[in-house]
Each structure stands twice: as structure tokens, then as C-alpha cells.
Amino acid sequence: MLNNTNVLTSSLINDLKYTSLANFFDNGIKANFDLLLKNVNSVGKNTTVYKNSPQSELMSQYTYNVSLPLSKKTPRTFNTLEPKLSLRLSPHEMKNNTDTSRRINVNSIFLSDRLNLDNSLETGESI
């Protein structure tokens, strides 16, 4: 059974990701920054998702990651602990994704695209 046969959508998404090398400070702090540029080109016909005319959006996300690698060596064990802090900024107006069922879990919390959105980035600032 065919549904919505008159609905046409097309999108082309380009991502440019840059991660700097880790910088180690004298006090043991490790820091680096990430830059994510997303170019979304889209057009649609008879759809509420995309506009009828071609749209091009350029979005960016800046992330500054800081961590303090700690270790403790005993005669029997070697323990490590690495507290992390991630500062993020996405200064552009993004799509409203509150209705999507995206969840951040332990494995994705420090990823640059942690919500795994194709056509948008996480909006605002976060720590």
C-alpha cells in the first residue's frame, strides 16, 4: 500500500569535524577542542518537514574538553580515574527536537553529536 505518493523530499548533509591534539599542562590537566560544522541543504514538495524552495543552513558547534587523568598504583593493582568537563556552545538557531525520543546515555555523553540528529545540532550551551 502506498501512502503520500505526492510527497517529495530531498536533503544533502555535509559534516566537517575537527578535533585538536590533546594539550597537557604542567599541572596534569589534559585539554582539547572540537569543531563541528554542518551544512544542510534541503527541498521538499507537499511536506511539512521541508520548504518548497531550496534551503541551505550552516550550523556550528564548539566544544572544549578538559580532563584530569589520575592513577594510583599499588603492589597488586593499577587504578585510574579521569574526571571530565565538556563545555559546549552552539550559537545558531536550531530545529525544535523536544518531541523526538533521543536520549543521552553514559556511552554518548561526551560525543560531539550525542543526540545523533541528521539535520540539526544540539542547541544552546551546556556543561
Task: Go through the PLM ranges and name each one.
Residues M1-I127:
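Outer-membrane beta-barrel translocator/pore domains, especially the C-terminal barrels
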